[in-house]
Design a protein with these regions (language model features):
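Core catalytic region of metal-dependent phosphoesterases/phosphodiesterases
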Residues: 6, 11, 15-118
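Conserved beta-sheet core of the metallophosphoesterase superfamily
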Residues: 102-197
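Extreme N-terminal starter segment of soluble prokaryotic enzymes
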Residues: 1-4
């Protein structure tokens, strides 16, 4: 079993494609590319952690519940088991579409193909504790955090962890091996160089 990580997919409409200048004609092309890129590297034995913002639901875009559910069902087309860490877009959906009931949303999404939906999580990679979170301000101190939320704007490295947003890996998921490599590189270079712009 291998673990994979991504964040900030914003499936569902073209707003993020346009705002972030993602190199896709429309959200359908983007969704197909993401599903294809995931399925090229991950099997049904693997787990894909999506660290928030699977769907685009914000002050501009308010799809109805049926449209949200259809967007969540994209998970059924992916080979690996998909675990969604709640992002700020999903938090809005919990509030607006599930009467503020996280467990109600979680149950619905599991019935639509997700392995699980969690608020945050803790795993180990290569024996190292790793905290999974959407928004980096909610990070856990004293461990490496994998996060999203900031898209490509804050870069890959932070002193407290790594940004696994899809925009930072050519719209492919980061593998467990990628994370091990990036953490070694972070410690050997970024953490030692005050001028590397990761602080």
């Amino acid at each position: 079993m291998m673990l994979f990580f991504t964040a900030d997919l914003h499936f569902g409409d073209n707003e993020t494609i346009e705002r972030e200048s993602r190199p896709f004609t429309d959200v359908s092309e983007f969704e197909e590319t993401i599903v294809s890129n995931v399925n090229k590297v991950a099997s049904s034995e693997d787990i894909l952690y999506v660290l928030g913002d699977w769907i685009n639901y914000n002050c501009i875009n308010h799809p109805d519940l049926e449209a949200c559910q259809k967007t969540f069902e994209i998970s059924k087309r992916m080979n690996p088991k998909v675990v969604l860490v709640l992002g700020n877009n999903e938090e809005r959906i919990v509030r607006d579409k599930y009467d503020g009931d996280f467990q109600k949303m979680r149950s619905d999404l599991i019935s639509r193909g997700f392995e699980d939906v969690i608020k945050d999580g803790d795993i180990e990679i290569n024996g190292e504790p790793i905290h999974l979170i959407h928004c980096p301000v909610d990070r856990k101190e004293g461990v490496i955090n994998l996060f999203g939320h900031t898209h490509r704007w804050t870069g890959l490295w932070k002193p407290f962890g790594l940004n696994v947003g899809t925009d930072l890996n050519f719209f492919r998921p980061f593998s467990e091996k990628d994370i091990i490599y990036l953490l070694e590189h972070k410690r050997d270079w970024c953490d030692k160089d005050a001028n590397c712009h990761c602080m």
